[in-house]
Amino acid sequence: MRIGQYQLRNRLIAAPMAGITDRPFRTLCYEMGAGLTVSEMMSSNPQVWESDKSRLRMVHIDEPGIRTVQIAGSAPKEMADAARINVESGAQIIDINMGCPAKKVNRKLAGSALLQYPDVVKSILTEVVNAVDVPVTLKIRTGWAPEHRNCEEIAQLAEDCGIQALTIHGRTRACLFNGEAEYDSIRAVKQKVSIPVIANGDITDPLKARAVLDYTGADALMIGRAAQGRPWIFREIQHYLDTGELLPPLPLAEVKRLLCAHVRELHDFYGPAKGYRIARKHVSWYLQEHAPNDQFRRTFNAIEDASEQLEALEAYFENFA
């Protein structure tokens, strides 16, 4: 699949997730087979651009793959400025967030709240597309409520404004992440527009990935929550799409290697004073299958030292084996 001048190496994209898809996680997903990774959502508010959190969220020139940054906001000029600053910092694709259902984002008329206001959507898309010379993409939901699904209208508007790829999560804003994603709306959009359409929502395994591609006709898939603690899902899905065969479960030794390497990268990226806190949630996700009684996770979450975290993981896997 192509986005503007960029040819993706496959049809699998790691979704932007606030507080999760930092540089270490993006790099790992790319190594595990994602064709594209997208940064955490960055606010278009210029007052926060110089914060440590914002600087860490920006892409880095030496990152692998096509550097893609997602921005969020409601003011067209601010969004355009945010796009320009990120391109100057190395972004090769700008993604606009109009899919986040979080209340703190929607209260500022950003994220999926914008779907209620097509005129504002048009203004934002036009300003951002005209502000940068890199491809601009858009992520939306199917609408703002089940009785108000307007993704076909927004999709056509996006194509007319110069958006070069569209990701659709198969729920409305009101649905949050409840219930099951629906793919009829994504299929309808794919039949309506000529730009690439990326399906998102509840793609949890290779069989589901194949089914969603076949049903929607989507050009690619975006995978988010299913990659938490399981970044190798991209490799599993790609293998199945290529061969029709399922890979065997990842050996425990490989899980250990990937987890420990990921934790070390988090320690290095955030520094020892913060990295151990960020690592906790990732370790919890990795070990959901292996530590169902939560005892180790509770013990691990009480550790406040980076080196002790790694020692605890080594001991855990030795005992588990």
UniProtKB/Swiss-Prot annotation:
UniProt-annotated binding residues for FMN? P16, M17, A18, Q70, K139, N200, G201, D202, G224, R225
This protein's cofactor list reads: FMN
Which superkingdom, per the lineage?
Bacteria
CDD domains assigned: DUS_like_FMN
The positions flagged as active site in the entry are: C100 (proton donor)
Which GO-annotated molecular functions does the record name? flavin adenine dinucleotide binding; FMN binding; tRNA binding; tRNA dihydrouridine synthase activity
SUPFAM superfamilies in UniProt: FMN-linked oxidoreductases
PROSITE patterns for this protein = UPF0034 (PS01136)
Record's keyword terms, sorted: Flavoprotein, FMN, NADP, Oxidoreductase, RNA-binding, tRNA processing, tRNA-binding
NCBIfam families (alphabetical): nifR3_yhdG (TIGR00737)
Q: What is this protein called?
A: tRNA-dihydrouridine synthase B
Name of the gene encoding the protein in the UniProt record: dusB
